[in-house]
């Protein structure tokens, strides 16, 4: 039941002093034309009803605090609770964005220090912390690309090259910025085919969007050559930082030749994510693009920290105020807590865990591409259909009954029946071994009775959804019964 369905007319969870009721007149504070004419359709519940309702929902929810969460390309690592305490300090949590600059110098220092550290980690020259999510960062980067070529007078550059192994939001972000997306095929080893890239490069190409390692978990070993090809053509090279967790302290996007980078603080730098946010997708650029960053940017002068707005070619604001500040605080705390050596070690263990799990699982389900991976890997689930009579979806649904969150499935699209698995560095060997045992048990079940696995899950509040009806007759908002 929803909280609305538990509503009982007249039931409340609070009372106001009788003598104060007549003193509180909304019209004293809110213009008449903005006052509601009718009561809002809010649920009427007692405090204990509300507490019990949401406590029950938490029992039905699943998070990295509950167990293994191996969603590929999502980096569902554990989020240190110390970071939450730091972000909740009153000096941070009670700030208001309209406070005078001289009174929020500490907050600006946090932002400036994070910008500086992210530049050092990625090899960029400047950063903005405004974007509220990864895809928002992508759009920001693409708008910078667009403005850059407008200023140069190269308006013929209307295309963005995206490999078929790209992170899912790349083509959408490029399209939203007004570019035509050109997809190029990967080669048999799962990385960019240089011949295909060369054939696609011409004076109409504004940028190439890449993730490295790519979404298959494979490092684009020809990245230096790709950067040379792009820059020789006058094309910018864009780095999707979704998979930065694999290479921290080992190699920097800026050193590979990338001009623009977006990061996901809610992934790589261990701030909570899922259920829509809050996230943070900072964008970094090389020196020749600094003047195109959105305003304002935090800068340090002899008088203190300022919000700089006089960038000559800025794309303008891309979000209200200054980004999701609480996420920024948590990310800075995480980086300072680990330090350079700690971040490097985190990437090393992330890659080690992925390769250990890949090696063990490949004995049950073949990998899509052979050889070592980075932070994640993709299994080819066509064997499930041929030998066990089940699909990747069935395996994923049955995992729920064992208390394990399924990996990403059916992505990337270039692998049929794909399972994309990213264990992250915060899981121990016992948890990885348990996951392997769960997969083994499910395959044994499928061998004996495929239909049993096909009808899973059995232990969850919601069973199999009618996906056909859901797609053809979607209900995306709550409607009161009387309507």
Curated annotation (Swiss-Prot):
Keywords: Oxidoreductase, Pyridoxal phosphate. It comes from the Bacteria. InterPro entries: GcvPB, GDC-P_C, GDC-P_N, GDC_P, PyrdxlP-dep_Trfase, PyrdxlP-dep_Trfase_major, PyrdxlP-dep_Trfase_small. GO terms for biological process: glycine decarboxylation via glycine cleavage system. GO terms for molecular function: glycine binding; glycine dehydrogenase (decarboxylating) activity; pyridoxal phosphate binding. One of its GO terms (cellular component) is cytosol. Its cofactor is pyridoxal 5'-phosphate. The keyword Membrane does not apply. It catalyses: N(6)-[(R)-lipoyl]-L-lysyl-[glycine-cleavage complex H protein] + glycine + H(+) = N(6)-[(R)-S(8)-aminomethyldihydrolipoyl]-L-lysyl-[glycine-cleavage complex H protein] + CO2. It is an enzyme of class 1 (oxidoreductase). The modification N6-(pyridoxal phosphate)lysine is found at residue 267. Its EC number is 1.4.4.2. Pfam families: GcvP2_C, GDC-P. The glycine cleavage system catalyzes the degradation of glycine. The P protein binds the alpha-amino group of glycine through its pyridoxal phosphate cofactor; CO(2) is released and the remaining methylamine moiety is then transferred to the lipoamide cofactor of the H protein. Belongs to the GcvP family. C-terminal subunit subfamily. The glycine cleavage system is composed of four proteins: P, T, L and H. In this organism, the P 'protein' is a heterodimer of two subunits. NCBIfam families: PRK04366.1 (NF003346). This is Probable glycine dehydrogenase (decarboxylating) subunit 2. It comes from Kosmotoga olearia (strain ATCC BAA-1733 / DSM 21960 / TBF 19.5.1). The gene is gcvPB.
């Amino acid at each position: 039941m929803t909280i609305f369905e538990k509503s009982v007319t007249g039931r409340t969870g609070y009372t106001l002093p009788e003598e104060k009721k007549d003193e509180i007149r909304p019209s004293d504070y809110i213009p008449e034309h903005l006052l509601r004419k009718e009561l809002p359709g809010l649920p009427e519940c007692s405090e204990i009803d509300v507490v019990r309702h949401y406590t029950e929902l938490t029992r039905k929810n699943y998070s990295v605090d509950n167990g293994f969460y191996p969603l590929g390309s999502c980096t569902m690592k554990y989020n240190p609770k110390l970071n939450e305490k730091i972000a909740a300090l009153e000096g941070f949590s009670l700030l208001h964005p309209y406070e005078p600059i001289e009174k929020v110098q500490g907050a600006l220092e946090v932002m400036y220090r994070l910008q500086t550290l992210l530049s050092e980690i990625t090899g960029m020259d400047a950063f903005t912390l405004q974007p509220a999510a990864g895809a928002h960062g992508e759009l920001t980067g693409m708008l910078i690309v667009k403005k850059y070529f407008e200023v140069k007078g190269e308006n013929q550059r209307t295309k963005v090259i995206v490999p078929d192994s790209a992170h899912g939001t790349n083509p959408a972000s490029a399209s939203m910025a007004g570019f035509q997306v050109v997809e190029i095929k990967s080669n048999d080893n799962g990385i960019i085919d240089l011949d295909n890239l060369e054939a696609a490069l011409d004076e109409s190409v504004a940028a190439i969007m890449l993730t490295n390692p790519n979404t298959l978990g494979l490092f684009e070993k020809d990245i230096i050559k790709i950067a040379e090809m792009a820059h020789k053509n006058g094309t910018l090279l864009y780095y999707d930082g979704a998979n930065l967790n694999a290479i921290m302290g080992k190699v920097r996007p800026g050193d590979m030749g990338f001009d623009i980078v977006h990061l996901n603080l809610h992934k790589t730098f261990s701030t909570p994510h899922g259920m829509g946010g809050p996230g943070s997708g900072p964008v970094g650029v090389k020196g020749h693009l600094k003047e195109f960053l959105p305003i304002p940017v935090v800068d340090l002068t002899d008088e203190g920290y300022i919000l700089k707005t006089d960038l000559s070619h800025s794309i303008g604001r891309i979000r209200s105020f200054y980004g999701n500040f609480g996420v920024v605080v948590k990310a800075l705390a995480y980086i300072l807590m680990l330090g350079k050596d700690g971040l490097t070690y985190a990437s090393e263990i992330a890659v080690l865990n992925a390769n250990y799990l890949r090696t063990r699982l490949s004995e049950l389900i073949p990998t899509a591409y052979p050889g070592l991976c980075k932070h994640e890997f993709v299994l080819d689930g066509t064997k499930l259909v041929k030998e066990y009579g089940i699909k990747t979806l069935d395996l994923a649904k049955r995992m729920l009954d064992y208390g394990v969150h399924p990996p990403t499935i059916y992505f990337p699209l270039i692998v049929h029946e794909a399972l994309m698995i990213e264990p992250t560095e915060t899981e121990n060997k016992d948890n990885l071994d348990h996951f392997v045992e769960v997969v083994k048990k499910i395959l044994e079940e499928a061998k004996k009775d495929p239909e049993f696995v096909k009808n899973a899950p059995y232990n969850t509040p919601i069973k199999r959804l009618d996906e056909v009806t859901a797609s053809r007759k979607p209900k995306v908002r709550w409607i009161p019964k009387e309507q």
